[in-house]
UniProtKB/Swiss-Prot annotation:
Mg(2+) binds at residues 45, 63, 86. It comes from Homo sapiens. A lipid is attached at residue 222 (S-geranylgeranyl cysteine). One of its GO terms (cellular component) is intracellular membrane-bounded organelle. This is Ras-related protein Rab-41. GO terms for molecular function: GTP binding; GTPase activity.
Length: 222
């Protein structure tokens, strides 16, 4: 059984102040895909769990096989269906990742602010994305676990500087407290919308997909 259970679709309109009658007038987008990348234990799965279920756990049953999660939200005048792909950080799974990058539209590269090595490895992940997708992708550099600020090894200024050098977006979050998690998804969805240079088909949707490949055994979300 997976960490997430089964596929779920969520409709979230309250945060955007929409009435039911207004939703019928909204346009939708073509398919896309959001991919989470980063080293093991940086909190990729925890961020997804916080966004999908508003929950956090330091230990849960390991994911076996593939999970698919989706969440539909309303942003500006568009319906955005987020389908999230979660990749395992273990070295044994790294050879699988390029095939999942190839059709991605958004890549979120995650590091742990209490682990300087995970921060150093973000260059590698961004290089992988650009090698497969060039400039046809939105990239967000994400520093997670800011609830552990007293153990911080990477400053926000260092994260911002690296994001400028790599020409990517930047944000810090806490999957544990939920700080900035919704903002993360709003920002990447907005960035995706801004890359659309022509009006999307009325019947389409933005789809950003999630698959997770995790090593068997106990793991930590923290």
């Amino acid at each position: 059984m997976s960490a997430f259970g089964h596929d779920e679709a969520w409709m979230e309109a309250g945060g955007f102040g929409l009435e039911a009658a207004e939703r019928t007038e909204y346009q939708s987008l073509c398919k896309s895909k959001l991919l989470f990348l980063g080293e093991q234990s940086v909190g990729k799965t925890s961020i997804i769990s916080r966004f999908m279920y508003n929950s956090f756990g330091c230990a849960c049953q390991a994911t076996v096989g593939i999970d698919f999660l989706s969440k539909t939200m309303y942003l500006e005048d568009q319906i955005v269906q987020l389908q999230l792909w979660d990749t395992a950080g273990q070295e044994r799974f790294h050879s699988l990742i390029p095939s999942y990058i190839r059709d991605s539209t958004i890549a979120v590269v995650v590091y742990d602010i209490t682990n300087i090595n995970s921060f150093k490895e973000t260059d590698k992940w961004v290089e992988h994305v650009r090698a497969e997708r060039g400039d046809d992708v939105v990239i967000m550099l994400l520093g997670n676990k800011i609830d552990l600020d007293n153990k911080r090894q990477v400053t926000a200024e260092q994260g911002e500087e690296k994001s400028r050098n790599l020409n990517v977006m930047f944000i810090e979050t806490s999957a544990k407290t939920g700080y900035n998690v919704k903002k993360l998804f709003r920002r990447v969805a907005s960035a995706l919308l801004s890359t659309r240079t022509s009006p999307p088909p009325k019947e389409g949707t933005v789809e950003i997909e999630l698959e997770s490949f995790e090593e068997s055994g106990n793991r930590s979300y923290c």
